[in-house]
């Protein structure tokens, strides 16, 4: 993106809401800092992520990842193109710009997207800009989406359509998992199933205990008992 010098005579500045930010506005922007870091980790080093605060356009960049693509850092000013995207979205139903292409000062081709960050009053207080460097070799880009060459790539994920389905799918998988473990005796299977579900956080879901109790044909009080035993470190008990 080009970086026009911002002055008090810039027409765009007159269109911005000049009210000072309150603490809630700062808290909202602060919460997006983790989004910057997370997107950069997910997409890869070929993508620059910039969080702008509209409190002061002369030093609007408050969080940036992979800023080497444009030479920007925290404290850099907003760009003229970002301002244009802002004005296109101010008062509009959409808070996401169309994708657009531009060239950084270094000459690299960038594909970009700008997202407006609004407060409770729907006032735009910040911008999240995502800029992908298209001049990076394609093989380098693809390498960020390929799992490492290790035997244990990662755990499976249940993409359930509802929390009830999530509990059911996780429960059935856990039952199969415990039944296949020869180190778990028949008398201890229910207890081990509940332990595994507890470690997976499934009991944080409302009514999960009832679902588990019904499926295992035990009382919900037994499930509660097992959970208390796990929390206290006492793994003794009998299935009921």
Swiss-Prot record:
Pfam families recorded: HTH_22, PAS_6
Transmembrane feature ranges: none
GO CC, alphabetical: cytosol
PANTHER family reported for this sequence: TRANSCRIPTIONAL REGULATOR DAUR
Homology family: To H.influenzae HI_0575.
Protein name: Uncharacterized protein YheO
Gene designation per UniProt: yheO
